[in-house]
C-alpha cells in the first residue's frame, strides 16, 4: 500500500535505512528457561528476553540474539564482549539498579562503555542506563522488572532503533 501511494505521488526514489542488529542479555541468578517444567520459589521464567525480541521483531528487525547470564561480573562481561563484536544496539536486562548483586553498570564500564546517563525520573523504569561503545554501538541497561523493561523499551530503545533505521526525530 505504501508503494502504491509513492507511485501515485510520482515518487520513484526513496531513501531507506537499515535496521540495526540487536543483542539482548538477560541477567539474574533466579532466571530459568521457560521450557523448564519445575520451578522453585526463588526462580522465575526468563520472559524479558523473549518479550523484547518479540517487540523488536514486530517492527521488522531480523538479527536479534538473546543470551542469559547469572548475576556474575565475569559472565556479564563475557556476553557483552561477544555481542559488541556484531550488535549495533545491546540491551542488558536486570542488574542495573543498586542491589548487592547488580553488576551490569560496573561490567559495562569495565567493558569500555561510555556512560551517557543512568537513572531517569519515571516509574516504572527509574534505573534505566544508556551509554555508547565505540563509534556505532548503543547500550541500554533496562530494569529487570518486566513492566519496567517494556516501558523503557518503548520510550527509549524503540526511538533509537527507528532513528538508526532512518526515521526523523519528528516521526
Q: Which ranges hold each PLM region?
A:
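Solvent-exposed alpha-helices and their adjacent loops that cap or buttress functional pockets
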Residues: 13-18, 58, 82-85, 121-122, ...
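Flexible glycine/proline-rich
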Residues: 107-171
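Short beta-strand segments
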Residues: 24-27, 92-93, 121, 142-143
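Short, glycine/charged-enriched hinge/interface segments at domain edges or termini
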Residues: 1-67
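Short acidic, glycine/serine/threonine-rich loops at helix termini
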Residues: 2-4, 34-38, 78, 102-105, ...
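N-terminal small/polar loop signature for handling phosphorylated ligands or for N-terminal nucleophile
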Residues: 51-112
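A general structural motif
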Residues: 43-49, 70-75, 119-128
Amino acid at each position: 500500500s505504501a508503494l502504491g501511494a509513492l507511485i501515485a505521488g510520482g515518487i520513484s526514489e526513496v531513501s531507506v535505512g537499515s535496521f540495526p542488529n540487536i543483542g539482548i542479555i538477560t541477567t539474574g541468578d533466579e532466571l530459568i528457561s521457560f521450557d523448564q517444567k519445575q520451578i522453585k520459589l526463588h526462580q522465575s521464567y526468563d520472559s524479558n528476553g523473549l518479550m523484547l525480541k518479540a517487540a523488536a521483531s514486530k517492527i521488522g528487525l531480523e538479527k536479534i540474539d538473546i543470551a542469559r547470564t547469572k548475576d556474575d561480573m565475569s559472565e556479564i562481561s563475557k556476553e557483552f564482549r561477544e555481542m559488541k563484536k556484531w550488535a549495533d544496539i545491546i540491551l542488558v536486562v536486570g542488574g542495573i539498579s543498586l542491589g548487592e548483586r547488580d553488576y551490569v553498570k560496573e561490567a559495562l564500564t569495565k567493558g569500555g562503555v561510555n556512560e551517557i546517563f543512568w537513572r531517569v525520573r519515571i516509574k516504572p523504569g527509574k534505573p534505566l542506563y544508556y551509554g555508547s561503545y565505540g563509534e556505532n554501538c548503543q547500550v541500554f541497561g533496562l530494569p529487570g522488572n518486566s513492566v519496567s523493561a517494556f516501558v523503557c523499551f518503548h520510550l527509549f530503545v524503540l526511538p533509537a532503533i527507528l532513528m538508526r533505521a532512518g526515521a526523523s526525530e519528528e516521526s
